[in-house]
């Protein structure tokens, strides 16, 4: 009954633009309008990319957790990432909806398709996926010039980082997505990719899960040289508090004071991911970036950032982690676990 009502509402939209069939990053064939003017984003990373491409004026709606840049918070919201409101999406009369396969449910795409609203899906497993998505969005949204310029600039920055860390010894890195229970980033994730390109080795790259849990004992056995936390008050209590947690003081990295809080851009598969790459590389290889690995790189709270990085309190919004791990999903979406379980 709901779909019938929404279908009637969808028919009331303005006459459809001329469209072309494209294959999105998930392999789906999508009827994408030529030069779409009304866009709805179902993921914060997509919202950030649209603004980076200069398309903020075309964005007519996004999710509750799209908070960067600040203008994104002023857009009409269509709900959370896992379970957006179809009614709100239809009411915005979008020409095209943009989503991420790993975060948005296939059911949402299918329902929108039945309503005649195309959804273009992206993927975000690696840093290269993030850069490729910029080019793909440029083609889908008819803004190739801006997309090419942005992608090339970001690739130059990546290449410069890789040039600086080439030949350097690779420290072992534990990235803490969640500290109780301990959850980290496994292989085939953009976080692991950032660590590798920054000249490190993730201690969890041999694990099968993309977002594996680790016992403290297992993490201690892997003996990381460096431990990284994202700058979020819930995920990253003050480092002094971490050091006092049972078992944590046994880490060699703790004894050597090599705990760092890094910018939350590391969990956003958007152009800002390159900011995180540069920061992590400078932490792991300060000599290659003419910086001392001193307390200026240690962030005591999410109100502070390393030099050259935003000091804004960013929401740990959403990424491909969403459907993989309940506690991680709660962190990414800001939803209580009970609500996530109900949505699933």
Regions found by a protein language model. Give the residues of each.
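Short secondary-structure boundary segments
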Residues: 43, 101-102, 177, 207, ...
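Short helices/loops that flank or line small-molecule/ion binding pockets
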Residues: 86-93, 115, 214-223
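A short, structured surface patch at a secondary-structure boundary
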Residues: 20, 37-103, 108, 203, ...
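Bacterial N-terminal signal peptides
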Residues: 1-10
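Extracytoplasmic substrate-binding proteins
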Residues: 22, 28-29, 96, 106-183, ...
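Short, basic, low-complexity termini and linkers enriched in Ser/Thr/Gly/Pro
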Residues: 12-16, 293-328
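A ligand-binding cleft/hinge motif common to bilobed small-molecule-binding domains
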Residues: 103-114, 226-244
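His/Asp/Glu-enriched short active-site or ligand-binding loop at hydrolase and phosphoryl-transfer sites
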Residues: 63, 188-211, 231, 260
């Amino acid at each position: 009954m709901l779909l019938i009502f929404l279908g009637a509402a969808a028919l009331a939209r303005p006459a459809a633009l001329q469209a072309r069939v494209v294959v999105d990053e998930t392999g789906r064939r999508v009827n994408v309008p030529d030069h779409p003017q009304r866009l709805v984003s179902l993921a914060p990373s997509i919202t950030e990319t649209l603004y980076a491409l200069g398309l903020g004026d075309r964005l007519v709606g996004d999710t509750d957790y799209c908070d960067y840049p600040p203008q994104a918070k002023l857009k009409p919201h269509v709900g959370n990432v896992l379970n957006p409101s179809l009614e709100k999406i239809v009411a915005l009369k979008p020409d095209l909806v943009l989503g991420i396969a790993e975060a948005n449910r296939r059911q949402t795409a299918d329902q929108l398709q039945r309503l005649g609203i195309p959804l273009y899906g992206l993927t975000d497993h690696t840093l290269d996926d993030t850069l490729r998505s910029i080019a793909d969005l440029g083609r889908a949204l008819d803004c190739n010039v801006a997309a090419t310029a942005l992608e090339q600039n970001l690739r130059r920055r990546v290449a410069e980082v890789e040039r600086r860390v080439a030949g350097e010894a690779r420290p072992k890195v534990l990235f803490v997505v969640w500290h109780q229970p301990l959850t980290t980033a496994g292989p085939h994730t953009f976080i692991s990719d950032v660590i590798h390109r920054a000249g490190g080795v993730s201690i969890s790259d041999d694990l099968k899960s993309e977002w594996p849990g680790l016992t403290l004992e297992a993490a201690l056995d892997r003996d990381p040289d460096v431990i990284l936390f994202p700058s979020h008050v819930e995920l990253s209590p003050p480092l002094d508090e971490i050091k006092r947690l049972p078992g944590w003081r046994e880490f060699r990295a703790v004894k050597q004071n090599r705990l760092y809080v890094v910018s939350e851009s590391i969990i956003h598969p958007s152009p800002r991911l390159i900011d995180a790459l540069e920061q992590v590389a400078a932490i792991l290889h300060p000599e290659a970036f003419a910086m001392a690995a001193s307390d200026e790189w240690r962030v005591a709270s999410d109100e502070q950032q390393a030099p050259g990085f935003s000091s804004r309190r960013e929401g740990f919004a959403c990424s491909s982690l969403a459907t993989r791990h309940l506690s991680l999903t709660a962190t990414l979406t800001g939803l209580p676990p009970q609500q996530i379980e109900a949505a699933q």
